Amino acid sequence: MLFGRLTERAQRVLAHAQEEAIRLNHSNIGTEHLLLGLMKEPEGIAAKVLETFEITEEKVVEEVEKLIGHGQEQMGALHYTPRAKKVIELSMDEARKLHHNFVGTEHILLGLIRENEGVAARVFANLDLNITKARAQVVKALGSPEMSNKNAQANKSNNTPTLDSLARDLTVIAKDGTLDPVIGRDKEITRVIEVLSRRTKNNPVLIGEPGVGKTAIAEGLAQAIVNNEVPETLKGKRVMSLDMGTVVAGTKYRGEFEERLKKVMEEIHQAGNVILFIDELHTLVGAGGAEGAIDASNILKPALARGELQCIGATTLDEYRKNIEKDAALERRFQPVQVDEPTVEDTIEILKGLRDRYEAHHRINISDEALVSAAKLSHRYVSDRFLPDKAIDLIDEASSKVRLKSHTTPPNLKEIEQQIEQVKNEKDAAVHAQEFENAANLRDKQTKLEKQYEEANTNWKNTQNGDNTSLSEEDIGEVIAGWTGIPLTKINETESDRLLNLEDTLHNRVIGQKDAVTSISKAVRRARAGLKDPKRPIGSFIFLGPTGVGKTELARALAESMFGEDDAMIRVDMSEFMEKHAVSRLVGAPPGYVGHDDGGQLTEKVRRKPYSVILFDEIEKAHPDVFNILLQVLDDGHLTDTKGRRVDFRNTVIIMTSNVGAQELQDQRFAGFGGATEGQDYESIRKTMMKELKNAFRPEFLNRVDDIIVFHKLSKDELKQIVTMMVNKLTNRLSEQDINISVTEAAKEKIAEEGYDPEYGARPLIRAIQKTVEDNLSELILDGNQIEGKEVKIDHDGKEFKYDITERQDSAKDKETSES
């Protein structure tokens, strides 16, 4: 905080506040201690104003001790609470509004009056201080010396009226203390000062990615000028931020824009102490250049070359390349200063420097752990933006979330409010019906409820103190999870159990295939526990095996268990990428081709849902060039689309399915469904499939995959379990039409027998159920049989399927009840 601008008396107030906090054994300096500090300076304007309202030091001490009392023995250094920081900030704002150069006790009092939360505000309320009158009294006590300051300031900048109307004076804003501190950019600021001190072409341009802090460097220069931390050549200079949009705005006729810009240049030249800062420098090119008129860049070129105009520009790398570099004459007048993205460690230091501002604004405490977490998590999971901007945004939003959460009215208060409203309506109705005795009772009840509400509200406000609210790592994790969809909060007990039992969850949908389910579950657990390689996807797998054994179903089951729905899976059918030219559809069409603006089918989906299961189905059907694209996804966890955007695959599970080798197996006719030699047969199947896989795909592709899993053929027992699962699904569908079905074990055995085919896995079962159950049921429904509300029992007597329709027990009971 900028304590350097405080008067001696105001500094003594802060010292008294610290003494009072120590006396009361409090661990922090809050608004109440600032108020006590003001009362300890009886000669100050603040104490005199409060005295006119009969507020004395004794009364304030009594109220403070009554509200918060004495604490335990305090340990360690004292720190200002977020609300106290906010009061100091508000007092500086009051001084600025009154055009005072220093902050006195009167400004601190105005800050306390404006801060309508905290202990000091409650003291004022308890002592019946009229806030509006107190403020007016302070302004009256000050008299109006600010007018002379205002006039002096107007005269000071009177020689640049046009510039003042179009630009912001960063040095004045820096003097007021409203600019955020600039941390860790000494090297860049020094380079800017060196370029500005040249004789000609003294125009630095700050080039860097969006959000790395280019504008902050210009603000840092303004602060350095205010603090006299610059060479003699720059002392007394004004840094003026010019917005080209403001210059162009309102210039209706030809020549108006040029005249306005020329006037600004003349004022800068005559003043001799102005450094122009143009954010978004590329807007110079073409600005005001309609219908053949000269644009802003060409008007400025002569002055920039001769050194008559000192200009700092700021623009992104892309805009500099597109707009500035193509105009060689403009480019040579600017000296590029590269602004690199800060490291995570530098970002943490920047966040620590900004902490006071955000604590004061949100009135919460921000822990060191939250700052470290914001820098690290934003760097790791928000890949399309740059530090420190994304980390600062994360802290800001998380603080806002915590602040709002702590100020939400509790349910018990809302309930009492509703009761009061209900009683009020009943009372009005009773009065309207001339039931005065009932109305009197309701009035008493309303009074009692209102008193209860006041007590509950007071208790809530006493316990809900923003100074005790703090921002934690967990809050940061919640916000970034909301941004990206990636779960980053601490693993709670429920989720821990779910992850540990993931195999059981997957086996509810996928029968058999223990190896595949275990391998996938381990990869998900590693990722959620934070142990996976941060530069690679969560897991990448190739599922091999004959058709119909559950390869695609396992991917669907994983998507449902991770996200709660099958739709969370991104499915890419590789049969659509059989031609060489179709490969570009994954990352987007090249420039000049139809669909370039639409983005890639794969990259766009992953950009929108970075935490997902990606299924590449039937990969052997795709053109070999597809696998060249997947190499860097599997190894580095990212892919660049046709627009140059980097798409992050580090939080995806990549599953590729293939039937390669299935034909070879069919030809060799291995034994498949159980038996004594099932283990030996599986090993033979595995060897055959791996051999075929190595023939079909390149070694550098296979070497990047985490695990290659060969699925087992399905046994008869497993097929029977699948029949049960399919029947359950059919039962659920029919229950929507109020039809119950039950299938006997004999019927299930027959369905499994009819759907048994070693070569095609479980898919023939679907056809068997359609043929034996669904077709006959649909005929029963359409044939006029009223089977709604009835039970259909499906059995097999050894020759054919039997359908026994009976009244449901529950519907029979309902019928009896309605008749009685």
UniProtKB/Swiss-Prot annotation:
Alphabetical list of PANTHER family matching this protein: ATP-DEPENDENT CLP PROTEASE, HEAT SHOCK PROTEIN 104
Pfam name, any one: Clp_N
Region feature Repeat 1, mapped onto this chain: 6-71
Name under which the protein is recorded: ATP-dependent Clp protease ATP-binding subunit ClpC
Purpose of the protein: Required for growth at high temperatures, probably by acting as a chaperone during heat shock and targeting heat-denatured proteins for degradation by ClpP.
GO cellular component terms attached to this protein's record: cytoplasm
Annotated Clp R domain residues: 3-144
Residue ranges the record marks as coiled coil: none
Spans annotated as Repeat 2: 80-144
Residue ranges, annotated region (I): 163-410
Domain UVR intervals: 417-452
Keyword annotations: ATP-binding, Chaperone, Nucleotide-binding, Repeat, Stress response
Species name: Staphylococcus saprophyticus subsp. saprophyticus (strain ATCC 15305 / DSM 20229 / NCIMB 8711 / NCTC 7292 / S-41)
Any single biological process term in GO: cellular response to heat
Gene3D superfamilies the record matches: 1.10.8.60, Clp, N-terminal domain, P-loop containing nucleotide triphosphate hydrolases, UVR domain
Region called II, residue ranges: 471-662
Family note: Belongs to the ClpA/ClpB family. ClpC subfamily.
Residues annotated to bind ATP: 208-215, 545-552
Molecular function terms, GO-annotated: ATP binding; ATP hydrolysis activity
